[in-house]
Amino acid sequence: MAEAGFSVTVPATTANLGPGFDHLGLALSLKMKIEATPALAWFIQYHDKEYASLPTDETNLIVQTIQQTAARYDQAVAPQKLVVYSDIPLGKGLGSSATAIAAGIEIANELADLQLSKLDKLCIGSEMEGHADNVTAALLGGMTVSYFTEEEMEVLTFPAPPIGVVIMVPPVALKTETSRGLLPEYLTHKEAIRGSAAGSLMTAAIANSDWVTAGRMMERDIYHEPYRKIGFPNFDEIRSACREVGAYGMTISGAGPSLFIAVPPETEQQVAALLDQRFPHYQAIAMQPAENGACVTK
């Protein structure tokens, strides 16, 4: 079992990309780094003011994940001091909870010497998160496509796509469970077919590096965007502006409240500056997809 300190780095993620609802995830270049050292009691120290409202004791999601992961294998872990550095906006649709869960799994694996397989980590994370899209991308990096039920887990990975990314962050946070409450319980068979076709074509286009087609399909979602977009100021106006500046497509990042914009490579800074100027109540952040998922450094 680990005695000396170590660190874990986990990327931010976006999920869905429109019609890839609850099964498509993309790792992003924003990161959370956690330094773990032995301590007399669990204590989490956040270096970013945005995280100041989170628990700093055993009720913290990272610690709960560590303890629950170890307990699955009848192991207990010694208390740690966890120093957290993160540039991932909290509660803004960039997978902050999935990042915490992925980090907790990696820390438990290290502290208790669990020797978890990749599939073990993916199953644990997806069960804890309740869906697989964000946590698979956080653990594996690149782009992930997942099939997850109580009985089965399948994940395929793609390399990080050669695009730029702009995330439009509003001033308010949104809990995923609140956003999920906006969704209908049922879709008609005809609607489901249309949504499935858009998601399949988008994924195939991404695999073929055809981001023009992928961007169009990204905006054809019927599973969640029509119901969630009402909570976004200037949603349609922002989408029109994205088209004007040459973006491939725009959609909701995960469950929101941020927006995900795919743009041609090396244009993300320019597009972010233009959107920042036009929509000052949002914060436009330029970034790229991330190739690497969670990693441990000793």
Which ranges hold each PLM region?
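Anionic-ligand binding region
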Residues: 144, 148-154, 173-204, 214
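Short beta-strand-to-loop capping motifs
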Residues: 38, 170, 261-265
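Glycine-rich, charge-dense phosphate/pyrophosphate-binding loop(s)
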Residues: 206-298
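ATP-binding N-lobe of GHMP and related small-molecule kinases
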Residues: 1-92, 106, 110, 114-116, ...
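Short beta-strand segments
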Residues: 9-11, 27, 138-141, 147, ...
